[in-house]
Regions:
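Membrane-targeting and insertion segments and their boundary/processing signals
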Residues: 67-70, 105, 112, 136, ...
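Intrinsically disordered, low-complexity segments enriched in polar/charged residues with Gly/Pro
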Residues: 15-19, 111-114, 147-149
Length: 180
């Protein structure tokens, strides 16, 4: 399956698709449609939030259009300082502040325009615990493997996947190579 990150930059075009960290939503920023209305529960899972954004833009026609024709929804980052106090966005999201400031967007005071971005392919090649597959001498770990994360991979799991299954697959492949 494909996993979409719900908040990829939709504007400016120079950073189209750039991932806006999940920490923004985790701190309380909410997605809003062109009418300024919240249309999905805050902190929904990635797949549910992505689907809701796509539906809001494509089916309900409540997206915000950029000068290039791209559509997205607002990510209300200024809400973070209202919830946690002034300076929270600067302190907790310095990389995001710098990234958008390069394009004269102050995410402390201005919302970001976002749209789901293809983020991770949850494999497709079925593996055994040692990383082996039904294809002779093929060992797999990481994004190519299937069945490890399910449909909704959580942040950080892919690193653990590569470490655990990569090590297992490497050992099993080395043993297999001795026999070849």
């Amino acid at each position: 399956t494909m996993q979409y990150h719900p908040t990829g930059a939709a504007f400016p075009e120079q950073i189209l698709g750039l991932l806006v960290t999940e920490k923004v939503r985790g701190l309380g920023a909410q997605v809003l449609n062109a009418e300024g209305r919240q249309f999905v529960f805050p902190r929904e899972t990635r797949d549910a939030e992505s689907a809701a954004i796509i539906r809001e833009v494509k089916e309900r026609h409540l997206g915000v259009r950029t000068p290039s024709g791209m559509e997205g929804v607002w990510l209300d980052s200024p809400l973070i300082d209202l919830i946690h106090g002034p300076g929270t966005v600067q302190r907790e999201l310095p990389a995001m502040v710098r990234q958008f400031a390069r394009f004269d967007i102050d995410i402390v005071r201005e919302t970001m325009l976002v749209y789901p971005t293809l983020h991770y392919q949850n494999g497709g090649i079925a593996i055994r615990p040692d990383g082996s597959t039904d294809i002779s001498n093929l060992f797999v770990a990481g994004e190519a493997s299937g069945g490890v994360h399910g449909r909704n991979r959580l942040m950080g799991n892919s690193l653990l996947d590569v470490v655990v299954y990569g090590r297992r697959a490497g050992r099993a492949a080395a043993e297999r190579a001795k026999a070849v």
